[in-house]
Amino acid sequence: MASTVRQRTVRVNGVDLSLREAGDPGAPLVVLAHGFPETGHSWRHQMLPLAAAGWHVVAPDQRGYGNSSAPREVSAYGTDELSADLLGLAELLGHERAVYVGHDWGALLLWDLCRMHPDRVTAGVAASVAFADWPAPPLDIMARRYGDRFFYINYFQRPHEAETELGRDVADTMAKVLWGASAGAQADPMFFTRDELPPMEGTGFLTGRAQPPALPWPWLDEEEFRTYVDEFSVSGFFGPVSWYRNMNANYERTRHRPVAAMTMPVHFVTGELDPVNLTNPAFDSSMRATLPGYRGSTVIAGAGHWVQQEKPAEFNAALLGFLSSL
């Protein structure tokens, strides 16, 4: 069973989730949760190594992405529904508890799972986005911080505008976003300091992004890229940007849940050149002081934001090393 990746669609929590699956269905379960803008395809380098190590591994296209259901209500993308999707998937596969691995938005969802449902998470690995216990609604903080300057999360709050821009030319969008946050690119404009950012008015998510080099890249070939384009051509971008539109609602759902209950073992992995953590250099010390079950971090040299794709061997070594310690 460990030698192939299987694909199927399951009905969970009122939505259809398309998933990739490998390993023995009777083995311990690990659920891989992708981020923005990705799908279960982003875990292609992890599926078989995890299965070979004795895990039953599933990587769903999360709601709004790829070939999974994409509800048209913004509220359908709150962390309560997203968490119920993953917990329901585990239950469907016969598991009350599972190991969860999340990248980018998948990492944010992992942190919420650990905080809201600590009894359902055996252990967790977060990639690229560290745990943060926001002191106030995060969208309010970002609105004050950036004011009239462009910041992509604030831009994503604008109804219709962001998803229309991103969906206009899916291949161009995916190429610029995937290249722009990788180690091979120069610093992406959306991560500059406030004074260096352009004005919000008249600026889009793709404005000013460099034209990527022709494929293949060291970590992504033409066929792998085309899979992303095909999947986002199906789903569009309303669902993906709607995850961002729930950030304040997610804060309200989680803020009274004690961080002290997050006692499950957790590990953090990031790329040395990930622009998210270049702006958050204290991520390790902050989590070490905050999370009871924190087991340290792995910083992977030469990797950008797409760490599990850019440096799969190094990422897998960190992931499997952590799992073997459980």
State what each model feature region is.
Residues 6-12:
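Short acidic-hydrophobic surface loop/beta-edge motif
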Residues 3-5, 16-17, 65-97, 101, ...:
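Flexible "cap/lid" subdomain of the alpha/beta-hydrolase fold that forms the substrate-access gate
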